[in-house]
Amino acid sequence: MARKMKTMDGNHAAAHASYAYSDVAAIYPITPSSVMAEATDEWATQGRKNIFGQEVQVTEMQSEAGAAGAVHGSLAAGALTTTYTASQGLLLMIPNLYKIAGEQLPGVINVSARALASHALSIFGDHSDVMACRQTGCAMLCESSVQEVMDLTPVAHLAAIKGKVPFINFFDGFRTSHEIQKIETWDYEDLKDMADMDAIQAFRDHALNPNHPCQRGSAQNPDIFFQAREACNPFYDALPAVVQEYMDKVNEKIGTDYKLFNYYGAEDAEHIIIAMGSVNDTIEETIDYLAAAGKKVGVVKVRLYRPFCAQALIDAIPDSVKQISVLDRTKEPGALGEPLYLDVVAALKDSKFKDVKIFTGRYGLGSKDTTPAQIVAVYENTTKEKFTIGIVDDVTNLSLETGAPIVTTPEGTTNCKFWGLGA
């Protein structure tokens, strides 16, 4: 399938795909996600039509909490609804996320992941915000590049509808949200072709309606609450297959090979990294550089983080692996490890990889740059089971020593850096 090439950033890529599947967008701007809401508002004003032949109804609320409440109400009324947020704004949505997930409403929250204010505020990128939502019941889908945002945002929307589970569709703030790339874009007819219209109609039929009234939002006593809470299990058990089904549809359309976990590197790798987000592009470049020197290394790119499918992860790891380094872009003080690391340990503990050494590392907090030389340090590390990269930690001595900068750019490439000064 031939697709149009356009130059855009990650925010516009997410907005382009999400607009197609949305009846309503409830918005409140926050850096670095504001561009998604602004683009959606602009397109609706210009009369752009979604796949249903309608303009998206855009409503700006008084806060992110209000936007989340509007998403909840709009979904309950039978309108496919999305929003765009990050950081403290996403935290304000958490109470509503529990309700949206508990009522199995197919909303999509598009997030350009950003740091949370702790010892200081940071408007820059990491995964602190999305990791604060991992127990809400929302599925979580991650993209690594602008092209992946374009390709996989439809998967979040379509899997939410068919799987009856809301999605947090996220990518790295600034590094992906504001990176401008020439990418292949979706035509809305192709997006419409992938949609399950029967599932969409079933969602609309389930809406609150005085012609067939039902009770929602009740309070339950101890005699039934636990049982009712467990009733959602089959939907989460089935969701990884639903996500892969739509990834396969995308693959069929555009010739890609998207999976819940994608492996890149040597077939007989002995040391691999497991990571999410834009760092995977850096890791891939570093793998190519090391492969030229005969190193057997690889990376598993996590796409579907929630629900975490242990078998899909196991299937993605080469049998030859002797050491795994898990990279997390968040910090949970006091925990035994960061979230992705703990999930990997739990997934592999009873598998054929139960004896493989698993190390845990932090990187990129507050948009700290992660370079190929730092990734080389991760692959060369065989002793420090807990580590950081990108900083010099002279307090707790967790940082890995980084060697001289390495050049992974292909020969013949011209690099340019442009500096802009002024208001």
Segments from the language model and where they lie:
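Terminal amphipathic helices with adjacent charged low-complexity linkers/tails
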Residues: 172-211, 315-353, 359
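Short helix-loop-beta junction
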Residues: 42-47, 285-299, 349-350
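Conserved thiamine diphosphate
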Residues: 123-173, 197, 353-366
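Peripheral docking tails and interdomain loops at the edges
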Residues: 323-411
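Redox- and metal-dependent alpha/beta enzyme cores, enriched for Fe-S-associated oxidoreductases
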Residues: 267-295, 308-313
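Short acidic, glycine/serine/threonine-rich loops at helix termini
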Residues: 36-41, 70-73, 93-97, 118-124, ...
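Conformationally flexible catalytic loops at phosphate/diphosphate-handling active centers
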Residues: 52-56, 167-262
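Thiamine diphosphate
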Residues: 1-132, 137, 154, 174, ...
